[in-house]
Amino acid sequence: MPYELKKVFASLPQVERGVAKIITGDPKGNNFLYTNGKSVIIRNIENPAIADIYTEHAHPVVVARYAPSGFYIASGDTSGKLRIWDTTQKEHLLKYEYQPFAGKIKDIAWTEDSKRIAVVGEGREKFGSVFLWDTGSSVGEISGNIKVINSVDIKQTRPYRLVTGSDDNCCAFFEGPPFKFKFTMADHSRFVNCVRFSPDGSRLASAGADGQIFLYDGKTGEKVGNLGGSKAHDGGIYAVSWSADSTQLLSASGDKTAKIWDVAANSAVTTFHLGTEVLDQQLGCLWQKDYLLSVSLSGYINYLDKNNPSRPLRVIKGHNKSIQCMTVHNSDGRSTIYTGSHDGHINYWDAETGENDTFTGKGHTNQVSRMDLDSSNQLITCSMDDTVRYTSLTSKDYSSSESVKMDVQPKCVAVGSGGYVVTLCIGQIVLLKDKKKVFAIDSLDYEPEAVAIHKGSGTVAVGGVDGNVHLYSIQGNSLKDEGKSLPVKGAVTDLAYSHDGAFLAVTDANKVVTVFNVADGYSEQNVYYGHHAKAVSVAWSPDNEHFASSGMDMMVYVWTLSDPDARIKIPDAHRLHHVSSLAWLDEHTLATVSHDACVKQWTVTFK
């Protein structure tokens, strides 16, 4: 293969305030699972930089859970589709697909022999279903709750018991198979968010929005007590997870803490304080082997440290909203990837290890649309919050003084030499020098969309929705229209000069990439066809002979300048999501980002 997926830096869990986030583990204890959008993310618990992404659902996925055998994963989405798929092969072949009810699936549980599966959620006619995994035949009826069911679990020892937790403040208890409703437990005064049997089957824990955790006998369903007396947490409890030996319980709460409970002593042995901000609310947790994980409202995954409860061992950061733009900074033989997302976050990633963090301080408050680097190690970004920001790559800290307010919303930014930056706003081209606006062109007869600056001559190429590239030159503190426009096949979506300045590549809405020869008076060098939908991004390789383009067709093409037919096609680079931006780390490594909030690196080999 001329290309190979080298690394995947996965997205964070997609979270919603006041809604529990289910994060599950595998039976062997090596991986953990969560969902974001239409993707199921499988990550190595020891080294989270190792990730695999399953994107076959047509609708956003809510929950995914390994079968106890470890060979299959069941995942459920907002439309009520349940997919059961293979974990042993990279292709993740679909084994079975069911529609237990029409509506959002909120939780899934397997029996310990991996033969029966229970599914609950927001069905229209019913809130749950329990059936054989291979035929779909019913093995009981889930009744007893009169509102949406949030959580389900099945006792992993015989005789089987099944329990559900619902928005009607009740848990329903079932015996089976076939599973029959026995009684409800109406101890909670608010929604029940999570119900879990202990691994040995002796106990059942239920956690609710009333801040209470009730314990029941796993076999009979009789109430045994409630953890911590009257209240276990000061806020709603979204998740609980048992230790492997069934003696302790981990809980996650909206009061921004997680706690470890000694079940026999009925007391909290460790309290993890995870911050004071709203984004520090804890929505999910997982206890797997020696690892204690919790999920914050920010989407961050915290590895909790029993020995130091005030500080997590590590925090996995990243994006959980679509990534809009990226750039790469190479220094001292190391590559750093900078990414900007739909919610205004900017992250920087070590391209080798995947270690990443976010800039500190108060930054953009809305979508980061474009970014570029200047020669003094600053990241220049423009955002829908109507600002252009200059952020030092050494301090990685937002400074309020380094922000330039625009009159209208900026869409694209390009950096030239000598402190010049050109920003395209809606109906406007603005020239900045040394972080100050010095010139603007307001009376445009076209809508500017993309901009690039020739590093040598200072020529500014502006791509318009009118299907032309308009050329300007920077003269002192002004922009002069060169009176020359280069026609392409459709509305310009992106453009880029090669690193040696010899060529200009332009992508357009009509699926075409056009390359112009700069030295030859911007004559058309070649036209490249291949995309099946609008091309959105283009980036040159450091060798100046190859360039990559991406489109709404989820394709990435790597083109050879001298031979338009010698193309490398990377289909489904980010499955079901278009690739929003590209950047080369070196002559053979291409990085891509997408609306799936993931960063991928590809090794490209040329003949």
Curated annotation (Swiss-Prot):
It is found in: Cell membrane; Cytoplasm, Cytoskeleton; Nucleus. PROSITE patterns: WD_REPEATS_1 (PS00678), WD_REPEATS_2 (PS50082), WD_REPEATS_REGION (PS50294). Pfam families: WD40. GO terms for biological process: actin filament fragmentation. WD repeats lie at residues 4-45, 48-87, 93-135, 138-176, 180-218, 224-263, 270-306, 311-351, 358-408, 432-474, 480-518, 523-561, 566-604. Its main location: membrane. One of its GO terms (molecular function) is actin filament binding. Belongs to the WD repeat AIP1 family. This is WD repeat-containing protein 1.
